[in-house]
Amino acid sequence: MSQQPLPLFGFDRLTLGLYLALVAIGWLMIFAVNYNPEAPYAFFDLSHMAGKQLAFMVICFVMMFVVMLSDWSFWRTLALPLYLVSILLLPGTLLFGREINGAQAWYHIGGFTFQPSEIAKFGACLAMAAFLSSPGIDLRQWRDRIIAFSIFLIPAVLVLLQSDTGSALVFFSFLLVLYREGLSPVLYALGFGTAALVILGLKFDPPSYTAAWLIALVNYLLINRLRERKRLWWAVFVALIPLTIWWMYPLRWLLGELEVSLPEEQMHLLVLMPHILLFIAAFLPNYWKKNSLIQGQMRVWLVLLSLSVTLIFAANAFFNLLAPHQQQRIKIWLRPKEAASEARGAAYNLLHSKMAIGSGGLLGKGTLEGNMTKLKYVPEQSTDFIFCTVGEEQGFVGVIGLVGIFLWLLWRITILAERQRSNFSRIYAYSVAGIIFVHLVVNIGMTMGLLPIIGIPLPFISAGGSSLIGFSLMIAVLLKLDSNRNLA
């Protein structure tokens, strides 16, 4: 018996309802941030932030209606052309775009601005789904891996050239999709390990102490494998711990007695010497064992340790090459004491963001009653920091409710993904879920100081037509594909 399509507009009503709820909450929060008691109905004015958002909401609803009237196969057939068009829009901002908050990522059209990276995310979802669902694709093959990575790395690099680090980071959400489709977990372990080493290199300055503790950890593992004179080995290992902590005091005294002057950087590097010597002494007895398997393991350890130490120093050196405002954002996240002296800028934003969220208490101050919202203590509160308004006016209960709706939506999208008969539809659904998830985690994390301030909107909530159109288009196509799942 042939499969029949679901009735016209037989879309998943729960997903649509969650989408509409988030859009409505977002508009209410934007209205609250920009509320003026002297002009309570200004939201009908397109010069008002809430008025603009209302206009974009109407555009999105019309767009979703048009998508539901389209043929479901249209989106797979034109996946590559739509992706290429979205990619071609990105470099144009470097020539014809407008710079906002240090990022030249917007086109200015009439009285509105348009951010092509939001559409590029949608295009990348289609392209990734089309590629991975093609016959013969196997992520165990390096050729297919390279193509899959290129699909999201190309727009990520182009967006990074616009100085929009936050939007570039979002494209790495496709790693979640690739994991679901069978990419080796070993690559993710290496990726997370690399990220951890980079964070350590950025957090601790000078990096020589971080490298010293890393070598000490490897020394512990090496000594634990030895069988002879273990007490002597452990005695030396334990003695190096206080020496690492207080190394600079005896070193400065010794150099003073010898009347030798060294730059501060070189003095810090000397802390590595005893750990390196112990590593060599513990490494050689393990390597000399007449066992090819053990020798192979030792070589791997040596290579990984060398790369790890190099990466720590490289991350620290890269930090020193960043622009001052980029360094400040990292300091706010990883070195808060060092950044505490900043009265304005990112430190100011984060301080007042946390104050606004905390001042809401359990139940919040009430809609339109947020003092910090009214007095504009937090810049960009309609866009990147709109979560502060939720925390201040709706309190802990409101925050939990909003996050709960997001998690419910993500859970529902995964349900839709798993019930698809088409690989294209399933992969597309997971791509959409991954992008929303990364936006949610990064936006809330940065407003609470858990992640660096990189400036990405909260989906469906933050003001901005490009963001709302991009996410609405993702949801609309998902609903369309799901409503025709019986045809796959």
Regions from the PLM with identified roles:
Residues 342-344, 357, 361-394, 424:
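Long extracytoplasmic/lumenal interhelical loops at the membrane interface
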